[in-house]
Amino acid sequence: MCDFYARFEEYCKTPGVDSGKARSYANAIEYLCDYLEICEINAQGIAQIKSLENDICDKDSELYQDLLHFLTVRGQKSYLAKGYIKAALKYFFEFVK
């Protein structure tokens, strides 16, 4: 998985994509995968993330609140609270096409 996150970070730095937040977006996807217990980025993992995208972005959803608690315990809540996970998903789905 470390290789995937490194490649995703590099993708976020490429001209035309250049998110300006490559490291933060790679971390955001890593932390989301940790929460979802996704150990390999494959079709199943991508589909799982895609199916939960609305709940991940909805502050009123049970999943959002549970993810926020998970990240808070790990000292990483800003990745969700400040919108890094939501923003990273756009780049993630483009990257895994």
Model-based region annotation:
Residues 17-97:
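Non-catalytic DNA-binding core/recognition domains of DNA-processing enzymes
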Residues 1-21, 25:
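Short terminal alpha-helical segments
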